Amino acid sequence: YLNLFKFKNMIFQKEIILPSFPRGFHLITNYIKNELPRMTGIINVFIKHTSASLTINENADPTVRIDFETHFNVMVPETANHFLHTLEGSDDMTSHIKSSLLGSSVDIPINNGNLLLGTWQGIYLCEHRNEGGARQIVITVNGEE
C-alpha cells in the first residue's frame, strides 16, 4: 500500500547544451547524470531539434553504434531521388525521417538522483546531420526529494 498523500511532488527542469558531435550515435548518459537532482521519480529527456533524436540502447559494445548508423543509412538513403525538402543538403530530409523513427524524448525512472537504467543501457544522442552543431536537451524530473 502506497500512501500518495505523504509525498510532496516537485518539478525540476534544466536545459543542457551538448557539444557538437559528428554524425552517428553517441552516448550522453553521463551528461544527463551530471545534471540530476537528488530526487526520486521520472526523468524526461527531450531534444529540441528535428534532425537529431534520442534513444536508449546497449552501451557496452561500441559496434552497436556503428551498426545503428549503418542500418539507418540503408533504411533512409541520402541517394533517394524522391525527396523535395533538400534545401539544406542531402542529409536534411533523411535526418528528419530518422529523427521521427527514433523520437525526440526518453523517459527513465530515477531513485535518489540515480538513473534506473538496465546494466547495458545507455542514453544515445543520435546525430543525423553531417554538421549538426551543438544540441539543446531539456531534462524534466517529476518526483520528490
Give short role names for the model-derived ranges:
Residues F5-E145:
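Active-site histidine-anchored catalytic micro-motif
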